[in-house]
């Protein structure tokens, strides 16, 4: 009965938002596309400085717009500048090179769960370093080639590196995407690929270790766990067995018109963030294609409506098919409703249906550097799980200085999927990101 009520509420909100919707600071011109970790995010760069016309890749255009949004910190000058300015100056010196761009962040998160299973600790504090780099190998105007790299390192502070609060609660929705599922990993090469641009950069090909969330179901407002929502259902379409993965594969982005884009990918379903490409030989792949329509740019009434389909072969879950739809619609006031709906067969994935609906405010109190968000997600597991799980999350991100943002986060986890008994727990959180 409760599950039916949640579905009805989500459906009504989805329809009402959808009907109303129809009708940080980096002055470069390099793409920074948010991504996810075992479901984030990460950052990816690609040079667009010699783009010959206005027909740009949708994700590249979004990244340029995001880079122009001012950080708008509360504290000026930066009181932490004495410690962080040397790193910033070093990064700036490197980034002045016409061929190399780098970026570094470190994100802390502390969570306390009010209710846990017997014998499970209530609190976890952890940190994650993200290092990104992009090397422009050549640019001939109509064609270009570049290498992109993402390295991450996660650490639990004061407790065992094996502990994962989300896993211990029995959640299938990944309540802390900064860690993802499983233990902390000290060093992971999450992304390492070659990008080849063709047709005056309307067509881009990617080959190497990739992240499917970068191409399928990516949201500019509902994706980056370092600065937006922490839970996994806000990181992509969780009915994808490969959602949040980092593995060997290939992807294509094609900008068909100034408003229509097509993305497609193939990825190894046995790959992992800490693994290499050797499992490609097992021939267990996921293939997916997404088509979407967008207008505007983030911060200027951005709208994006998309649909996608996928199929996969996995080692432990068998083969399956599925699809999904998603949207975000930024209003002039800064309020931005968004939603996702994913569906799948009983095989090939651990979650066969997920619904999410929420709203962001991208300039709360007129502050462009801050962000507020709230979302509600509900999932229906495939066979073998115990409960339908729902997560309500809300956060506020305050840009304290040009180098630091922080803010509270609250998650209500209702009936974790793999818990032995049904229960509800509130996760009280605080997050801080340092931008070098």
Question: What is each model feature region?
Answer:
Residues 100, 140-145, 201-205, 259-264, ...:
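Repeated loop/turn-to-beta-strand initiation elements of outer-membrane beta-barrel proteins
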Residues 21-113, 118-120, 136-142:
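N-terminal periplasmic/intermembrane-space "pro-region" immediately following the signal or transit peptide
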Residues 243-244, 275-283, 313-319, 343-354, ...:
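Solvent-exposed loop/turn segments connecting transmembrane beta-strands
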Residues 424-436:
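Outer-membrane beta-barrel "beta-signal"
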Residues 95, 135-139, 195-198, 209, ...:
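Residue-level signature of outer-membrane beta-barrel architecture
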Residues 161-193, 200-290:
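Surface-exposed coil loops of outer-membrane beta-barrel proteins
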Residues 289-382, 394:
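Detector for outer-membrane/organellar transmembrane beta-barrel domains
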Residues 104-110, 147-153, 205-209, 264-268, ...:
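Transmembrane beta-barrel strands of outer-membrane/channel proteins
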